[in-house]
Amino acid sequence: NTLNAKRCDVIIGTNTTYDALDTTKPYYRAGHVWIYREDSGYDISSWDSPDLKKAVIGLVDKSPVTQALSRNGLMANAKPYRIQRDLTKSPGEPVEDVVSGKIDVAIMWGPLGGYYAKQSDVDLVVVEIPEYAEGNSRLQGKTYWNISAGVRKREVERREMVEGAIFRNLDKIYAIMDEYGIPHTEPIFVDRLDGYKRHKK
């Protein structure tokens, strides 16, 4: 709405396949992460981790990872957060609760969780949930997306200008993301869970 009202001209950090926008080629790919205290002794690298089975797990209500929790018998461990529906809540509340000990593990959208974990005074571990590893197949649901910048439909010249600026400065962009704790991986161009291509390399 803000874009179409011409209150801004570019939206950064949007899903590459978002049809309401004309998006640039993706410049990174992001997914969900597990976050836990370093002093917890946890070692989580897959949905089969014994540590997940004994943990209180916080996640945003109706998050895409809910399907994975259900498939792995972890819903009884889950504590939902209604952050998206309550503007009085901090987006970093699950991380704050990991720090305070209210929950053991937070599952969050990587760019959001990584940022808040980086700000913490307590040492936290941020682990990217494997995208296509065993145990995170189609049955687990889609938890990763290519990320682009977007402009209004039919503004081809503006899109090309923004795209050029992004890719000329990609190393600087990645350095800033690293500084703020934002996990990122290389975009992929055939996503079997999307079922189609949006951009070619």
PLM regions and their residue ranges:
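Ligand-binding "clamshell"
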Residues: 15-30, 115-153
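Bilobed "Venus flytrap"/periplasmic-binding protein-like clamshell domains
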Residues: 33-90, 111-112
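Ligand-binding clefts/hinges and TM-proximal coupling segments of bilobed small-molecule sensing domains
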Residues: 64-85, 160-201
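Extended ligand-binding regions for polar small-molecule ligands
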Residues: 39-41, 47-65, 137-184
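Solvent-exposed loop/turn segments at secondary-structure junctions
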Residues: 10, 15-20, 40-42, 62-67, ...
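Alpha-to-beta junction loops
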Residues: 3-13, 54-56, 94, 98-108, ...
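Extracytoplasmic small-molecule ligand-binding "clamshell" domains
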Residues: 1-19, 87-88, 180
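Sec-exported extracytoplasmic/periplasmic mature domains
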Residues: 4, 8, 39-40, 70-74, ...
